[in-house]
Amino acid sequence: MKQFEEQIERFKQALFEDSDASDSDSSIGEALTNRGLKRKKGSKNVYYGCVGNSSGSSIDIDYYNIGNTKRGVVSHFRRRIDPEWLDHDNPYNDINIAEIMSPLTKPQDLLTHPAISSIFEQNYLSILASSALEIISAEHKYTAHLEQLMVALLGDDPSLPGPPHEVFGISPEQCRELTITVQEALEKSKEFIRCWTNVRMDLLRAIRFKNKVIAYCQGEDYNGNTQVLSKNESDGKPNS
């Protein structure tokens, strides 16, 4: 009981001690990260992503009230009228928000839209479908071994000789327990195959739909034959 009370007392002392306590005489100073400096004073207030440092921010931060929140702005882009302004100084210079967020005006734009075309150009669905097929094939081999073992345990294999009159292997009780275990493993394996088969079928269905969309945007019908889009369709307008 006394040892338990002493432990509680140590916990209380730890709660009320200086949170910045350190066995080092030096401070972390102007460092913006405490990596390798965790034993120095002030290291607790420094972490990756923190603006400034523990001894006082060296960066001028402007605070603005936006709605019910207070936002801090570390830096502002210089105006283009500034003679020292250079486009490559802007990290977002190569990003065209208007082009990325623009809607599709006609089906052909799907193949060149910067934000949407990559979804149809990449072959991740085919890779996932191939991976699912490999998993199903490997599980089929495992299921075949379990079925062979089950046939041997049940004595249904005509190629095997009859059971001996004397028991040289496992006991009948052990054989029954092993049969139940193999049966449960076989059922789980078949359920695993069914689930992965459904996943692969959904992936293949998604691939077919994707190819149909691409074919339509390329001016082809679902069978690959070239079709002529009406003027309204090519302009992105519905037919009247």
Swiss-Prot record:
GO biological process, one term: regulation of transcription by RNA polymerase II
Location of this chain's protein in the cell: Nucleus
Entry keyword Nucleus: yes
Self-association and partners: Component of the RPD3C(L) complex.
Family according to the record: Belongs to the RXT2 family.
Signal peptide: none
Job of this protein: Component of the RPD3C(L) histone deacetylase complex (HDAC) responsible for the deacetylation of lysine residues on the N-terminal part of the core histones (H2A, H2B, H3 and H4). Histone deacetylation gives a tag for epigenetic repression and plays an important role in transcriptional regulation, cell cycle progression and developmental events.
Knockout-associated phenotype: Leads to sensitivity to camptothecin, thiabendazole, DNA damaging agents and microtubule depolymerizing drugs.
InterPro entries hit by this protein: Rxt2, RXT2_N
Annotated organism of origin: Schizosaccharomyces pombe (strain 972 / ATCC 24843)
Keywords assigned by UniProt, alphabetized: Chromatin regulator, Nucleus, Repressor, Transcription, Transcription regulation
Gene Ontology CC annotation, any one: nucleus
Metal-binding listed as a keyword: no
Protein name (record): Transcriptional regulatory protein rxt2
PANTHER family for the chain: TRANSCRIPTIONAL REGULATORY PROTEIN RXT2 (PTHR28232:SF1)
